[in-house]
Amino acid sequence: MHRPQNRTAALLAAFGCALAYLPAGRALAAVCAALPLSAAGQSFALHCAAAPLAEELVFQGAVQGLLRPLGPRAAVCVQAALFAVQHGGAAGIAYALVLGVLLGTIRQRTGRVWPGWVLHTVNNLLVFAAG
């Protein structure tokens, strides 16, 4: 009887946490834009340093942790979906969904956020270098 309530509370808390990231992400971008760097340097600071850490802490850390009552697979999949929708158009969402599942699985298996943060940072470095 308590399990559905725990699941509902977990989903509501996770969605709330993900929604709270929207203005926080914008604030993070504003901070990076104020750095005394070139536009390319500011973009690098945001996409290859600040954003991967913030996203890992929020999505694979807090959101996935809040979703534990749903079970490990559901927690990974739901956090990955929430992570993905924050990444723009259809191609960005599809790519971020796969990345979110991978990062969430790493978090689930290791119990830590930092291995996913390293992978996320390397991913963003490669995307930044290619773009």
Where are these regions (language model features)?
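Transmembrane helix-loop-helix hairpins at the membrane interface
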Residues: 14-29, 40-131
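Membrane-helix interface linkers and caps
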Residues: 1-12, 66, 70
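Membrane-interface interhelical linkers
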Residues: 35-37
